UniProtKB/Swiss-Prot annotation:
This is Sporulation protein YpeB. Belongs to the YpeB family. It comes from the Bacteria. The gene is ypeB. GO terms for biological process: spore germination; sporulation resulting in formation of a cellular spore. Keywords: Germination, Sporulation.
Amino acid sequence: MIRGILIAVLGIAIVGTGYWGYKEHQEKDAVLLHAENNYQRAFHELTYQVDQLHDKIGTTLAMNSQKSLSPALIDVWRITSEAHNSVSQLPLTLMPFNKTEELLSKIGDFSYKTSVRDLDQKPLDKNEYTSLNKLYQQSEDIQNELRHVQHLVMSKNLRWMDVEMALASDEKQSDNTIINSFKTVEKNVGAFSTGTDLGPSFTSTKKEEKGFSHLKGKQISEQEAKQIAERFAPDDNYSIKVVKSGKKTNRDVYSISMKDPDHKAVIYMDITKKGGHPVYLIQNREVKDQKISLNDGSNRALAFLKKNGFETDDLEIDESAQYDKIGVFSYVPVENKVRMYPEAIRMKVALDDGEVVGFSARDFLTSHRKRTIPKPAITEAEAKSKLNKNVQVRETRLALITNELGQEVLCYEMLGTIENDTFRMYINAKDGSEEKVEKLKNAEPIYKDL
């Protein structure tokens, strides 16, 4: 009798374990399929965007009307921006693809800077048309290479997840067709992009992709990176894995993953090899019922920054918002009463227990430096006179921002309203030009079940 019961219980346990394993396998396959679909979508969109880019640049070469040329160049700039976005969604962060991205930036910067000037007063000269023709030829080379990769992907049913795993393991990469093809794209772009002269009137405005080699401190080991990561683990039960960044990249970081098997929580981090500075942190866990206020969450975020060596006395809060049960905050350093927006630090705090679940200091670490900040050439009153007459100005301060051309400019930052909408406007403190206008989000209404 007892033996029969034990056999039955054991049988149920085996069936249950098998079913659990089957469900786990199904969930894993679903996640992998979702990632693969996203990679495939981004790649095919990139190929289509480069096709569009080549055609659009060719169209501008045939135009004779300055009235038509300006919007066409804006289209070129828009397409290059979309192509950049597609590249960022591919698993290429661990392999060099800098030359191709740099060429896209050159095309985008040239087209934008040319389109915003008065082409009736200052039309394209002979050198600029020559430069545009070179960019047209180079975009054709990228187009042909990407079409070749697309043909291989579709004809051989190649998977992008294999690319991600090959790059992460740094093993047998030479056997991966997609990796080899993208290396060919990068090699060919590097061969011709160095000879592209966009003329004396053009200064590249591409924001340099900075690494962390300029940071203070010594080079840390994997073990030291692990010890630093342990400070961010909520308890001792986390298993920590450290991975170096890929070869020939400018990331200069250790990538950390920390897993808690009991709570099914995962923390991902990047820590700089030089100085051991945390670059970003993301904690993937369920946030339960809210128990602390948004203001308390901001105080927890500041305490986190102070604990990790940031001078919190020099920080001002720029953004404070709540999304569901998570507080989102942005802090900006202030120097001589000027807000330094290129050095912003962003945080997410869970409002159930005040734990930091998101942190990014990448902008701060790459941009923080001593600057000579010029004095405003126009007064605050002169800056206000440049605004739309319907704007009611509520607040004004000086701020350093990065404009659409990737240049740092000193501005008057003004918060103003038009009826029920709030706007943030930036007026160049040197020449009074309008650099940027942002509409701030209104408070979201809360809908309850009727």
